């Protein structure tokens, strides 16, 4: 018995030593020396391990969510910031030899930090050096690298044309890679659909380092999957070829806020019927936030109707007076501007801000953040709305964005791309909780508030499954530490509905060993 115990202890010590050596940064660097065609330049210029003085700076550069920027947050074994696509093959060759995961970071806006952290040992490939945007006015298209931000993309388009744009997100520091691969919506989705509905080509690298430079070489199945199915489950998308869309020389934006005492309830009730059925050139978003009341410590809900119409003052007022006269929109509430300037408006910049600010990929104010999402298929009743507004005041910290669907969104079949939330949806809800105070107990409190409000909203939103939007990633709806099919189906059905099974089949075909995985990746079928 004593001899058996000694043998077991020796075996365990050997296994531990082997595991530690396989996840040691220096061992990884030696592997790169073997695999890299020009290892000296490769290692010194684009690879960072914890002993490098720049490691922390490089890691934190694209972490906007302070929840995942703490001393206790798991850090990568190494960060690779390739400057050419040929740098990636040796990284993948070494990664296949190590018992580790690979995370791909575009802009770092994954709300659960899955693009740059992991509970398992991992390498991080950061695409921040890939930010080329090549606009082709003759074709009306552009090739955009996945490390570019939406702001950089918008700026480059407007640099070439005042009458072309692209339907994508409001936050200009979002990385193109994560945004498009999750669906990507913005103020023109009722007119032109999502970002993925306007992608016509892609380039991708698989786990073996093979590069597919166009749609034909990768095939229609893989091309379908990386347009809304979460590209990080299938490989490293190098770039997307996008179709640019016509925009008028002038668009009109407006923002009108009303409290309950100023008639907000009636306006919200009308908004639920108007926003998805009005002219598709018009997008009117509703935000529900808290403001101070007249008495000390009193809080009340402010409903803000923020809109953009693809047209000038007259067209905007005509449509609003016809379809939403209750808001009593006036010309003085509106501002005419170029489409590129509306990008700044939606991003929260003051009118007149130079467009060059879009070239700054840095998040100016970092916060602790939690996001959740829902889909609404029938109008919330007046009674239900009253309860929702009351709950917002009770919890104090939760805010809501209601984003209208309809128009083009209702015409595209749910199976056209992996993003399934099409016809039948009135609007999408984004739940927002941001805070600045540090501390584990503070974080637990706010996460509990988010979950409490999410449970409270159950009667008013979709069910079986309760649908969710991948770009508002929420680990609470399900996760899989082992990327199993059974666990993956729990969150997969919510993000992708019936499209989940097709994604699993494609994943199994193109990544049978499940090399590309995270806590909410597409699993393989076993």
UniProtKB/Swiss-Prot annotation:
Keywords: Cell wall, Disulfide bond, FAD, Flavoprotein, Glycoprotein, Nucleotide-binding, Oxidoreductase, Secreted, Signal
Family matches, as SUPFAM superfamilies: FAD-binding/transporter-associated domain-like (SSF56176)
UniProt crosslink position (6-(S-cysteinyl)-8alpha-(pros-histidyl)-FAD (His-Cys)): 109-171
Annotated disulfide bonds: 31-94
Keyword Disulfide bond among UniProt keywords: yes
Location within or outside the cell: Secreted, Cell wall
Protein name in UniProt: Berberine bridge enzyme-like 11
Any one GO molecular-function label of the UniProt entry: oxidoreductase activity
Domain FAD-binding PCMH-type: 72-247
PANTHER family documented for this protein: OS08G0158400 PROTEIN (PTHR32448)
Keyword Disulfide bond set for record: yes
Record note on cofactor: Binds 1 FAD per subunit in a bicovalent manner.
Secretion signal span: 1-21
Similarity-based family: Belongs to the oxygen-dependent FAD-linked oxidoreductase family.
Post-translational modification, as annotated: The FAD cofactor is bound via a bicovalent 6-S-cysteinyl, 8alpha-N1-histidyl FAD linkage.
Top enzyme category: oxidoreductase
Catalytic activity, EC: 1.1.1.-
Glycosylation sites: 52, 136, 273, 482
Cofactor names: FAD
Any GO CC annotation of this UniProt entry: plant-type cell wall
PROSITE patterns assigned: FAD_PCMH
């Amino acid at each position: 018995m004593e001899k058996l115990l000694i043998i077991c202890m020796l075996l365990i010590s050997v296994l531990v030593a082997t595991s530690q050596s396989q996840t040691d940064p220096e061992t990884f660097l030696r592997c790169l020396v073997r695999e890299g065609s020009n290892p000296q330049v490769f290692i010194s210029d684009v690879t960072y391990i914890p002993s490098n003085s720049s490691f922390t700076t490089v890691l934190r550069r694209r972490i906007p969510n302070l929840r995942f920027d703490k001393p206790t947050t798991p850090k990568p074994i190494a960060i690779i910031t390739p400057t050419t696509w040929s740098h990636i093959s040796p990284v993948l060759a070494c990664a296949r030899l190590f018992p580790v995961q690979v995370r791909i970071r575009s802009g770092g806006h994954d709300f659960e930090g899955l693009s740059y952290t992991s509970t398992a040992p991992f390498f991080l490939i950061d695409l921040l050096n890939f930010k080329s945007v090549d606009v082709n006015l003759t074709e009306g298209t552009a090739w955009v690298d996945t490390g570019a931000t939406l702001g950089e993309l918008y700026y480059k388009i407007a640099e070439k044309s005042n009458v072309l744009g692209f339907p994508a997100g409001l936050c200009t520091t979002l990385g193109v890679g994560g945004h498009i691969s999750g669906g990507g919506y913005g103020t023109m989705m009722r007119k032109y659909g999502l970002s993925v509905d306007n992608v016509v080509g892609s380039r991708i690298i698989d786990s073996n380092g093979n590069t597919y430079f166009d749609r034909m070489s990768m095939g229609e199945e893989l091309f379908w999957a990386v347009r809304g199915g979460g590209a990080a489950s299938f490989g490293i998308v190098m770039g997307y070829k996008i179709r640019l869309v016509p925009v008028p020389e002038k668009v009109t934006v407006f923002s009108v806020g009303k409290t309950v005492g100023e008639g907000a309830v009636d306006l919200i009730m009308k908004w639920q019927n108007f926003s998805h059925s009005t002219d598709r050139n018009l997008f009117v978003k509703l935000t529900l936030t808290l403001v101070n009341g007249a008495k000390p410590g009193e809080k009340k809900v402010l409903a803000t109707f923020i809109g953009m119409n693809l047209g000038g003052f007259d067209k905007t007022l005509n449509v609003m007076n016809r379809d939403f006269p209750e808001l009593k929109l006036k010309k003085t509430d509106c501002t005419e501007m170029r489409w590129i300037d509306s990008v700044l408006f939606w991003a929260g910049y003051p009118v007149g801000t130079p467009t060059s600010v879009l070239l700054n990929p840095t998040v100016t104010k970092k916060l602790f953040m939690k996001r959740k999402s829902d889909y609404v298929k029938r109008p919330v009743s007046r009674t239900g709305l009253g309860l929702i507004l009351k709950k917002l005041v009770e919890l104090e910290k939760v805010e809501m964005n209601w984003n209208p669907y309809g128009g083009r969104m209702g015409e595209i079949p749910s199976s056209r791309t992996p993003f399934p939330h099409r016809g039948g949806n009135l609007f999408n809800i984004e739940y927002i909780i941001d805070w600045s105070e540090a501390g584990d107990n503070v974080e637990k409190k706010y996460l509990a508030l988010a979950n409490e409000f999410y449970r409270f909203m159950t009667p008013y939103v979709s069910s079986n499954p309760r649908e969710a939007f991948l770009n508002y990633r929420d680990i609470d709806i399900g996760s899989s530490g082992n990327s199993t099919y059974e666990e993956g189906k729990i969150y997969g059905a919510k993000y992708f509905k019936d499209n989940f099974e097709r994604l699993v089949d494609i994943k199994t075909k193109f990544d049978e060993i499940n090399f590309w995985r995270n806590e909410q990746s597409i699993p393989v079928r076993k």
